[in-house]
């Protein structure tokens, strides 16, 4: 049963994270440690050999999954623990990109005067964690996936997308098809 195996993996990850957090607490480091916990993409939804059930439904209500530019492939939850800074038990539905982690971690670490070989693409999301601002407001996000994942499905293979607010446009290189979405809650 694929779902039982998947649940076992999740249970193992949960146990490992719990062990780490217990160690930090036991050794007096919990209040001096920032934890960022997230996935790198939506769940695998385009192949039946790893999961049970109909394809492209594993991230319901979001459409599709890993390798897709639909919301099931690019929207992932994230948990942040930053004692004394990020308010516990709060929720934020703003969006960001992986490129935002580098400037965020630098800011969290108090690194201010640094030099880079090239410009930093990301924007620190510390204001979202402190409740002092919204760096995603008015910002466009871009994805380019000109590769073949070996499977086909919603938002998968040879495409690119741009998102601004609740609007997203997906363009399929192979067919020239365009899909425009508004209100990204269920796509």
What are these regions (language model features)?
Residues 185-187:
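Conserved small/polar residues in nucleotide/adenosyl-binding loops
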Residues 6, 10, 17, 34-39, ...:
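Beta-strand elements within well-structured catalytic alpha/beta cores of enzymes
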């Amino acid at each position: 049963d694929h779902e039982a195996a998947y649940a076992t993996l999740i249970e193992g990850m949960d146990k490992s994270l719990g062990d780490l957090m217990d160690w930090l607490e036991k050794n007096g480091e919990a209040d001096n440690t920032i934890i960022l916990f997230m996935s790198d993409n939506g769940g695998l939804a385009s192949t039946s050999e790893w999961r049970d059930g109909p394809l492209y439904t594993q991230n319901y209500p979001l459409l599709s999954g890993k390798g897709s530019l639909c919301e099931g492939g690019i929207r992932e939850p994230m948990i942040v623990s930053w004692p004394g800074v990020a308010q516990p038990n709060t929720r934020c539905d703003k969006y960001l990109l992986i490129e935002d982690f580098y400037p965020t971690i630098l800011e969290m670490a108090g690194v201010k005067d640094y030099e880079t070989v090239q410009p930093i693409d990301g924007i620190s999301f510390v204001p979202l964690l402190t409740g002092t601002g919204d760096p995603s407001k008015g910002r466009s996000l871009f994805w380019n996936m000109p590769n073949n994942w070996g499977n086909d499905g919603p938002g998968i293979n040879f495409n690119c997308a741009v998102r601004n607010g609740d609007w997203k446009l997906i363009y399929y290189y192979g067919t020239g098809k365009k899909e425009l979405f508004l209100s990204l809650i269920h796509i």
